Amino acid sequence: MQENTRLRIAIQKSGRLSKESIELLSECGVKMHIHEQSLIAFSTNLPIDILRVRDDDIPGLIFDGVVDLGIIGENVLEENELERQSLGENPSYKLLKKLDFGYCRLSLALPQEKKFQNLKDFEGLRIATSYPQLLKRFMKENGINYKNCMLTGSVEVAPRANLADAICDLVSSGATLQANNLKEVKVIYESRACLIQKENALSKEKQTLVDKIMLRVAGVMQARESKYIMLHAPKEKLDKIQALLPGVERPTILPLAHDEKNVALHMVSKENLFWETMEALKEEGASSILVLPIEKMLK
């Protein structure tokens, strides 16, 4: 098959989105062999090439039409879009789907000993960040004047090194901030991974493949957030038992062999079934309660 007929997907080579991007593609049926030092992987069962690059490069590859699809954090995508716009360009792309991983937030943080009342406390401060465009937009919207200190890494050490008075950096758990004697005071941007497509139209063959992948991505995400529940229930308690089950679609009710008083319920729940709910089900007479993960799902 000619190279230009193969779908090109850019993902992060290393970092917080890399592993989960590969897992998502694998769960969508894309078979590939990833070698640690290799920058490109070829699918063995679909006409797909996986480009493993720096996350900062993925938006540009999409904007310029070099690759067809990309998995990228919204924070990196928007930072790069704002950067291009600041240069007078008009970058474009198609947002196909927000994904269920890579959650983080871009936040302002101060040294623990500094008091914080409101955003005016940042007036005139020197703020270290790797996201100058997102910070600039937020501060402009809130009428705050500040001094920018651009760093490409280790932003959290800037106050301790007297490079800045505060920072604007990504936060997941907050452990890194705490380890550097910093406190998160204001979230300025919420982010997660997303799947994007270049703006230019794809060939019919590529678009058909993208549509197939999107159907599978939706199925994988639905399966991840769903559980398959099986239990036995007294016929006389069916209404009460169904009312206890969170996010359940219409259940399948099956007769039990040699048992006239009970039935089997099979159902898909879009919410986790906690121990408290299982105990409440048991109190209403349910038994043999099984909660199972779902590997794949298509509606």
Swiss-Prot record:
It comes from the Bacteria. Pathway: Amino-acid biosynthesis; L-histidine biosynthesis; L-histidine from 5-phospho-alpha-D-ribose 1-diphosphate: step 1/9. Coiled coil: none annotated. SUPFAM superfamilies: GlnB-like, Periplasmic binding protein-like II. InterPro entries: ATP-PRT_HisG_long (IPR020621), ATP_PRibTrfase_cat (IPR013820), ATP_PRibTrfase_CS (IPR018198), ATP_PRibTrfase_HisG (IPR001348), HisG_C (IPR013115), N-reg_PII-like_a/b (IPR011322), N-reg_PII/ATP_PRibTrfase_C (IPR015867). Feedback inhibited by histidine. One of its GO terms (cellular component) is cytoplasm. PROSITE patterns: ATP_P_PHORIBOSYLTR. NCBIfam families: hisG, HisG_C-term. This is ATP phosphoribosyltransferase. It comes from Campylobacter jejuni subsp. jejuni serotype O:23/36 (strain 81-176).
